């Protein structure tokens, strides 16, 4: 039997198995328009009071901040302060087609994608819109690797974790449509030995699977902002274009966060205070959270003093242990056009995570997509095969570029591949990409009928031809590295935070976002951070309820003594 015929049969069989396994996941969201019901309690910061008080002030309306706010609003007054715009101002964030466009759009200081370049010289981006990076990413959704929970320093309630994932998934996670290129990718992964075949699954497991997406079957994005709709609208207020400059502290009776100072788009300062038993919760992300703590005087004492920032509390690890997962890749230009697709099929191993997507050609390079602006641009549809190093172990730090202006992005350095284990994992991952390119499934996408990885029209840096030449692969990894946009760390549990995400040494101050752990939790982290916001919100509600019961019991006991 011809190899091409056998490949076609295998493709059909794999698709059949994947479709059969769709039913194993609980009921997910259904296709709909993006739900902006929360607009009735969202305001431009210019319309907010100059001074107000709330039970909880959440800095950052992003991937964790939105579900956290919705949860706390069930019982308490909550203010969310987001530096960016409402997504309605930038409709391209609401579609799958807009993913590349948003990276192409020039950064004017207001656009949803804020550009920055690390001190490693690698282009990168961060979200600047309500919904955070969940509003600008590629939409991949997965639950966290189960092994991370035991190593996290947090005493997780796993039943609650699972219920919390479902709370998110019921609203903004979808089973992806059949996409021809993704099916080809899945078949190639399986031919290359990325086993077993898990079909459709949200769980992070070694093997090949179709994963969830926050794009529905019409290509509409659903993101963290929609989780605000699950809150109590009478208790919830969202302010956009609100740049939080500093956390306010009190020393009586102990060091306590009592509120924040923020400015609106006109430069007018506002103050938001927290009531008794309330908290300031920083959810400004891996870049924004350590930056705000440093500007507020919480960080390494000698460093803050050198910048003439009054030291509120010496915390040596704020801004330290900053990690970013490197992305290395190969682009192929097929002889015939292929349909653009988002990522829905993943290949997972212990050391690396892989995916592919296809795209239309473009004349303006998407910022941070390729390692440099001099990278050649595709003149036809192309396929992008990416490998992400798990972990990683390499880390750097964040320092302030401005000691007084929160709008000036800080300096960040990730030190990609400074740890040799990460480099070894990249080599293994790119060799697996070589095996992928050698499969029968990808033969129709060659321009010449040549063996192995040869015969493709490669855009950019090609893979080393000798799959046994580790030194050549190491050079490839260093020269082709880009960001996977999954940076994390800077305010770690066990270093800056306790196991309840409280900043140690300060009352009424927590951090709930991607800065809290030293590793990426899954093939894509957004599922974990969406869960984290809801989870910590529930734990806070439980703490408050238990505290109120203790007070009530004490009052009853005192009353009985009087009687």
Curated annotation (Swiss-Prot):
Cofactor requirements of the protein: FAD
Catalytic activity: (R)-mandelonitrile = benzaldehyde + hydrogen cyanide
Primary residence: other
Active site: 486 (proton donor), 524 (proton acceptor)
Tissues expressing this chain: Seeds. Localized within cotyledonary parenchyma cells.
The EC number(s) this enzyme carries: 4.1.2.10
GO cellular component: aleurone grain; vacuole
Subcellular localization: Vacuole, Aleurone grain
Residues bearing carbohydrate: 145, 162, 379
GO MF annotations, alphabetized: flavin adenine dinucleotide binding; mandelonitrile lyase activity; oxidoreductase activity, acting on CH-OH group of donors
Signal peptide start-end: 1-27
Keywords per UniProt: Disulfide bond, FAD, Flavoprotein, Glycoprotein, Lyase, Signal, Vacuole
Binding-site residues for substrate, renumbered to this chain: 355, 484
Disulfide bond entries: 426-477
Binding, FAD: 63-64, 82-83, 129, 133, 137-140, 244, 485-486, 514, 525-526
Domain of life: Eukaryota
Post-translational modification: Glycosylated.
Annotated coiled-coil segments of the chain: none
Protein family per UniProt: Belongs to the GMC oxidoreductase family.
Subunit annotation: Monomer.
Entry function: Involved in cyanogenesis, the release of HCN from injured tissues. Catalyzes the stereospecific addition of HCN to a variety of aldehydes in vitro. It is a major seed constituent, and could have the additional role of a storage form for reduced nitrogen.
Annotated protein name in UniProt: (R)-mandelonitrile lyase 1
Organism for this UniProt entry: Prunus serotina (Black cherry)
Protein encoded by which gene: MDL1
């Amino acid at each position: 039997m011809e190899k091409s015929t056998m490949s076609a049969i295998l493709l059909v069989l794999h698709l059949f198995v994947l479709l059969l396994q769709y039913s194993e996941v609980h009921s997910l969201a259904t296709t709909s328009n993006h739900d902006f019901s929360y607009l009735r309690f969202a305001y431009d910061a210019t319309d907010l009071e100059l001074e107000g008080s709330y039970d909880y002030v959440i800095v950052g309306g992003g991937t964790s901040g939105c579900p956290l706010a919705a949860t706390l609003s069930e019982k308490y007054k909550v203010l969310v302060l987001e530096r960016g715009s409402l997504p309605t101002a930038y409709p391209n964030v609401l579609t799958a087609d807009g993913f590349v466009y948003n990276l192409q759009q020039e950064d004017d200081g207001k656009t949803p994608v804020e550009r920055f370049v690390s001190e490693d010289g690698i282009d990168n981006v961060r979200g600047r819109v309500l919904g955070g990076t969940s509003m600008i990413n590629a939409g991949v959704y997965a639950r966290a690797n189960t092994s991370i929970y035991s190593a996290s320093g947090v005493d997780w309630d796993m039943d609650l974790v699972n219920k919390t994932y479902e709370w998110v998934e019921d609203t903004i996670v979808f089973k992806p449509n059949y996409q021809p290129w993704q099916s080809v990718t899945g078949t190639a992964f399986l031919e290359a030995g990325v086993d077993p075949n898990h079909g459709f699954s949200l769980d992070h497991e070694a093997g090949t699977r179709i994963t969830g997406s926050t794009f529905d079957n019409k290509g509409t994005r659903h993101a963290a902002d929609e989780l605000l709709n699950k809150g109590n609208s009478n208790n919830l207020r969202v302010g956009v274009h609100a740049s939080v400059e500093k956390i306010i502290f009190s020393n009586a009776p102990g060091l306590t966060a009592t509120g924040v100072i923020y400015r609106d788009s006109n430069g007018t300062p506002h103050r938001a205070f927290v009531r008794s038993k309330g908290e300031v919760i920083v959810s400004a992300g891996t870049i924004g959270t350590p930056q705000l703590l440093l500007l507020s005087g919480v960080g390494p004492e000698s460093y803050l003093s050198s910048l003439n920032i009054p030291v509120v509390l010496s915390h040596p690890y704020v801004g330290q242990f900053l990690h970013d997962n490197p992305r290395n890749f190969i682009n192929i230009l097929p002889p015939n056009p292929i349909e653009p697709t988002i990522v829905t099929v993943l290949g997972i191993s212990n050391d690396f995570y892989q995916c592919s997507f296809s795209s239309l050609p473009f004349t303006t390079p998407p910022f941070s997509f390729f390692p440099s602006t001099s990278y050649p641009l595709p003149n036809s549809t192309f396929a992008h095969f990416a490998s992400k190093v798990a972990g990683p172990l390499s880390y750097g730090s964040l320092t302030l570029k401005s000691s007084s202006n929160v709008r000036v992005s800080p300096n960040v350095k990730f030190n990609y591949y400074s740890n040799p284990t990460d480099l070894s994992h990249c080599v293994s991952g790119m060799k697996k990409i070589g095996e992928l390119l050698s499969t029968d499934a990808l033969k129709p996408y060659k321009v010449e009928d040549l063996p192995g990885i040869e015969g493709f029209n490669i855009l950019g840096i090609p893979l080393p031809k000798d799959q046994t030449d580790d030194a050549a692969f190491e050079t490839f990894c260093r020269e082709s590295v880009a960001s996977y946009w999954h940076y994390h760390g800077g305010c770690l549990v066990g270093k800056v935070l306790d196991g309840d995400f409280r900043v140690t040494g300060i009352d009424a101050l927590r951090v709930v976002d991607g800065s809290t752990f030293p590793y990426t939790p899954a093939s894509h982290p957004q599922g974990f951070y969406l869960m984290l916001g809801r989870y910590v919100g529930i734990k806070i509600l439980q703490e408050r309820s238990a505290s109120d019961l203790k007070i009530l019991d004490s009052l009853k006991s005192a009353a009985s003594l009087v009687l």
